[in-house]
Amino acid sequence: MQNNNFNNGAANNNSNNNGGMMIMMNGTIRTMEVFAGTVKSAMEAVYGSECKVDVHKVVKNNGLHLTGITIRNRESNMAPTIYLDGYFADYKDGRTMENICKEIVEVYEKNKVQKDFSLEKVTDFDNVKDRICFKLVNREKNAELLEDAPYVEYQDLAVIFYILVSKDNTGTASITVRTTLKEMWGVDTDTLYDLAKKNTQRLFRGRVLSMMEVMAEIIGDSADALDEEMVEAFFDMDVYEDSAFPMYVATNVFKMNGACILLYDGVLEKFAEKIGGDFYILPSSVHEVLFVPANGDMDARYLIEMVREVNATQVAPDEVLSDNVYMYHADKDFVEMM
């Protein structure tokens, strides 16, 4: 499952028409506009005249602009947005248009909204209050989004809210809570925060793992693909609890939008008790943060430089959380931006 946004609308879906797709594009497509139009035509061929297919621009996390396509059916006036930018990159790398469109059909069929989830249910607060969750985003980079969405400030970040439509081990489908929806519900931001905190902790259980434990999971997930020498090399790496630079990964069991574990009840306090003092918080991405015990040899400036270098070279633009580093002061139960 991709990380899908949902939109309103109405259309019909003839889900058993996949065999009717005919992709017929000679030559090379050079622009996203032409590519998106070709995909749109293919989806209309698959789902028939009663289907409504739309292509639109979407502003994602950190102000990233993407091109999305929605396929709407009459059974639900909502539809997932499937982003085309990655597919266009694949096309330019040689992937065929037919192969791409077949995958888009598969993605839609897996993620389409079921009959029991509709816009009417979203606007009824009682129907969605147990699905309201939160996540952390960069406040400055999401200024445009925050103009039209309730949020709570946290350091240089913002806590925003969403309705969880579905989730599995490959992703989530969600609806961002906008100001108009909040006003329709007749609730305040504090109420949203309290509900979201309870729901997020319940639906996305948090965990803090040492690097040794993370490496063990990686080995376990890919053991068949690694030979004995590679496995030994992993465990010879000097990055664990007994190293001079121990690091711990804090996220949730789904490893999705896990940076908000910082807001979970007791997480920071319990970790401080475990290590016996203060620790740095490194915003690895929107999906996880790193905890690094503070000691006299630790240089905050080095950590900040490291975070900024990793963000610039290793983290996807829409997954960057912050270029800053924070410290948790155990004696004051207080987080400070360095």
Where are these regions (language model features)?
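C-terminal structured domains
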Residues: 253, 261-338
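Short glycine-/aliphatic-rich beta-strand segments at the starts of folded cytosolic domains
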Residues: 245-257
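Charged, alpha-helical interface segments at or near domain boundaries
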Residues: 57-248
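Short amphipathic alpha-helical segments
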Residues: 27, 31-39, 92, 96, ...
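Glycine- and charge-rich intrinsically disordered segments
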Residues: 1-18, 223-236
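Basic, alpha-helical nucleic-acid-binding regions used in initiation and control of genome expression
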Residues: 31-32, 44, 99, 103, ...
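N-terminal alpha-helical "arm" segments
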Residues: 2-9, 17-60
